[in-house]
UniProtKB/Swiss-Prot annotation:
PROSITE patterns reported for this sequence: COA_CT_NTER
The gene coding this protein: accD
Zinc finger (C4-type): 32-54
The protein's name: Acetyl-coenzyme A carboxylase carboxyl transferase subunit beta
Uppermost EC category: transferase
Annotated organism of origin: Xanthomonas axonopodis pv. citri (strain 306)
């Protein structure tokens, strides 16, 4: 500090005196991973994590997705919430599986990668499940398969449609064959729904790959995808290395799959609630959801 600064009253600050740093609450601002725009967190959350500048669909947590689908205060019944993963194989790679489970549970706040709930959509009963990619990349293990199967059974008991939002890297390798068995279990559960004449709508979000895409994610009576979602079994880089050819532009993206008849339609996340309400009402031969709301 200079001799002049010492003589100046304490209330006067010189140019060299550092100003107090104002702390910005964490998560108040986010950056769009597509266009790079700075986005105000609360507004982005209200917009269902879709960038208002470029319409890029960013990652959204499972509970936020389900809350945006169900009627307010109706999704009070969570299905098989008490189930948690078990390290039956005592698997260890760079880290023990048990340690990975604890770390993922702490980071995500969830017991496992799939959340299933029962509620209503525009007055009509509905069962829905959603993957949380924040939990071990949305990988499918025994708990995911069991929760999915139980959700399908609840839909069967209630006699209502079942909707699942997929976002997964595939089967969870740390559970070995226990994980692969879930492909058959979930597909069999959907078979029972189909026999009962109850609709299943599969919503494929970014990314939907591996064993999830090879089982229930592609078994919907109607398969809907979010814009520009990566959907496929193996990733494009793996395929290029295997076939030693350059893949077409946009390969495995939802727009490419729609053009080639792999999925039925693409829907913006902000319109997804209305779209699913219309489709389920039509398939269940119920009144138009807007008419039901008006009544």
């Amino acid at each position: 500090m200079s001799w002049l600064s010492k003589l100046m009253p304490s209330g006067i600050r010189t140019e060299n005196t550092p100003a107090k740093k104002r702390s910005v609450p964490e998560g108040l601002w986010e950056k769009c991973s597509n266009c790079g725009s700075a986005l105000y967190g609360p507004e982005l959350e209200e917009n269902l994590e879709v960038c208002p500048k470029c319409d890029h669909h960013m990652a959204i947590r499972a509970r936020a997705r389900l809350n945006s689908l169900f009627d307010p205060d109706t999704a009070t019944t969570e299905i098989a919430a008490q189930l948690g993963p078990v390290d039956a194989l005592k698997f260890k790679d760079q880290k023990r599986y048990g340690e990975r489970i604890k770390a993922s549970q702490k980071a995500s706040g969830e017991y496992d990668a799939l959340i299933a709930m029962r509620g209503t959509l525009k007055g009509n009963p509905l069962v829905a499940a959603a993957f949380d990619f924040a939990f071990m990349g949305g990988s499918m293990g025994s708990v995911v398969g069991e929760r999915f199967a139980r959700a399908a059974e609840v839909a069967l008991e209630v006699g209502c449609p079942f909707v699942c939002f997929s976002a997964s890297g595939g089967a969870r390798m740390q559970e070995g064959l226990f994980s692969l068995m879930q492909m058959a279990k979930t597909s069999a559960a959907l078979g029972r729904l189909r026999e009962a004449g109850l609709p299943y709508i599969s919503v494929l979000t970014h990314p939907t790959t591996g064993g999830v895409s090879a089982s229930f994610a592609m078994l919907g009576d109607i398969n809907i995808a979010e814009p520009h979602a990566l959907i496929g079994f193996a990733g494009p880089r793996v395929i290029e290395q295997t076939v030693r050819e350059t893949l077409p532009e946009g390969f495995q993206r939802s727009e490419f799959l729609l053009d080639h008849g792999t999925i039925d339609q693409i829907c913006d996340r902000r319109q997804m609630r209305d779209r699913i309400a219309e489709l389920t009402a039509m398939m269940m031969r119920q009144p138009h959801p807007q008419d039901a709301d008006a009544a």
